[in-house]
């Protein structure tokens, strides 16, 4: 194998680099097309050099001040290119937005919009139908489809006449309410809620719930026009009696026993002739005598409790059975 000269190595590496450059030049980097168009447009606007065919930027005031007649030299092809570049930069429906970098940039620039802004922008975007075809249009559609935030109302500072009362009076008023009324009052306002908490902690006497009222509430749901005690519109109080629990069904009568006691005695007498029908140990007296710990005391000692020495003396004399 022959040795390779360093010149050949340099030539090979240069050829590889050229190939890589040529292959990489086939595809534009993200945002490169935008930079090219922007540089062309800025060069067309800022170029005032003589001897070059450019589209001039007309300024009527400066022309009138100088009093000179300027005849622009138009290059049709160059003017077309510049016009297209400017339109692509200014219009939101340009194909430049197909670059993923620009889509990300535009999507990050989209701010959270209010409901009024959404209405205005939806009207504007409806006029420009091609906007919906671009990625920017997709981002705008996503923002338009979001549910707008509910406008938060400012906290009401004004208080009613009941809430303006001192806290001790509010607590006394709350103490006269029933348990089922406290559930609704607790959510009226923050001040009444504090009064309810104080009433529960310190001043509530736990006389509620009224049992009769609770039973009546179970039976009848009051109409909003009704007040306690439940009255009709004509003013006649009608106390609704709670329904009685239905009686439980009676059991069916027991069938008569098939064996009779007289027949059982005759059978046992024949079977157990040598033995008594029931042994003495099985006989249980009809009336059991309750054992008495103490003998009946004389009427002069009506006491039930005794001292320790008295009990010891009674045990020594065998007075306890």
Curated annotation (Swiss-Prot):
Region (Disordered): 1-23, 228-258
Biased composition regions of type Basic and acidic residues, renumbered to the chain: 1-13
Domain of life of the source: Eukaryota
One GO cellular component term: cytoplasm
Domain F-box as annotated: residue spans: 159-207
Protein name: F-box protein At4g35930
């Amino acid at each position: 194998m022959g040795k390779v000269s360093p010149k050949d190595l340099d030539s090979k590496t240069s050829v590889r680099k050229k190939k890589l450059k040529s292959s990489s030049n086939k595809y534009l980097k993200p945002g490169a097309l935008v930079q090219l168009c922007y540089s062309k447009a800025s060069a067309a606007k800022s170029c005032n050099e003589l001897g070059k065919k450019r589209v001039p930027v007309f300024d009527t005031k400066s022309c009138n001040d100088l009093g000179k007649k300027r005849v622009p030299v138009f290059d049709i092809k160059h003017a077309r290119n510049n016009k297209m570049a400017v339109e692509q930069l200014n219009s939101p429906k340009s194909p430049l937005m197909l670059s993923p970098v620009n889509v990300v940039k535009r999507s990050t620039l989209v701010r959270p919009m209010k409901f009024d802004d959404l209405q205005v922008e939806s009207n504007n975007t409806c006029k420009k139908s091609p906007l919906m075809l671009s990625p920017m249009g997709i981002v705008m559609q996503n923002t338009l489809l979001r549910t707008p935030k509910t406008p938060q109302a400012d906290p009401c500072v004004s208080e009613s006449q009941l809430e303006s009362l001192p806290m001790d009076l509010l607590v006394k008023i709350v103490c006269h309410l029933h348990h089922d009324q406290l559930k609704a009052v607790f959510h009226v306002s923050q001040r009444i809620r504090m009064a309810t908490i104080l009433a529960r902690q310190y001043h509530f006497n736990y006389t509620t719930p009224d049992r009769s009222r609770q039973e009546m509430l179970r039976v009848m749901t009051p109409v909003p026009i009704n007040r306690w005690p439940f009255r009709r519109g004509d003013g006649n109080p009608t106390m609704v009696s709670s329904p009685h629990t239905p009686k439980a069904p009676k059991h069916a009568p027991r069938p008569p026993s098939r064996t009779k006691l007289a027949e059982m005695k005759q059978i046992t007498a024949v079977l157990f002739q040598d033995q008594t029908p029931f042994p003495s140990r099985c006989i249980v007296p009809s009336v059991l005598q309750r054992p008495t710990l103490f003998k009946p005391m004389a009427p002069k000692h009506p006491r039930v409790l005794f001292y320790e020495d008295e009990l010891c003396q009674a045990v020594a004399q065998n007075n306890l059975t």
